[in-house]
């Protein structure tokens, strides 16, 4: 198998796996965050050690302070799955803390 073909197959597998994760478990992203004393500093008045979680109830996120590349610190953000529109159903936003705050459809005949 040529290296171009291997790369294409690898990219397809990664896309398929990430699509399954996104549909079944919501979205997971990793990004930069301010660091203070080797801890995550989300500018909310608290510092979080690697492995600690905190929540953004307004946007329904779970955030985890993680070890990044080359000793850096990063944040991993988990959010709700995206739902396709269901005609005749009502999208409910229950509130609370992730994952209980994730929206869901309530359908009259289900």
UniProtKB/Swiss-Prot annotation:
Residues of the signal peptide: 1-26
Keyword Disulfide bond listed: yes
Localisation: Secreted
InterPro entries per record: SVWC_dom
UniProt PTM: Contains 4 disulfide bonds.
GO molecular function: toxin activity
Family: Belongs to the scoloptoxin-16 family.
Protein name: U-scoloptoxin(16)-Er6a
Organism: Ethmostigmus rubripes
């Amino acid at each position: 198998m040529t290296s171009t073909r291997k790369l294409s197959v690898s990219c397809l597998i990664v896309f398929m796996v990430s699509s399954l994760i996104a549909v079944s478990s919501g979205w997971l992203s990793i990004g930069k965050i301010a660091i203070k004393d080797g801890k995550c500093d989300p500018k909310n008045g608290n510092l979080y050690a690697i492995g600690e979680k905190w929540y953004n109830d307004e946007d329904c996120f779970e955030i985890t302070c993680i070890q990044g590349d080359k000793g850096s610190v990063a944040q991993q953000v988990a959010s709700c799955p995206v739902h396709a529109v269901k005609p005749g159903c009502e999208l409910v936003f229950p509130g609370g803390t992730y994952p209980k705050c994730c929206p869901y459809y309530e359908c009259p005949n289900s």
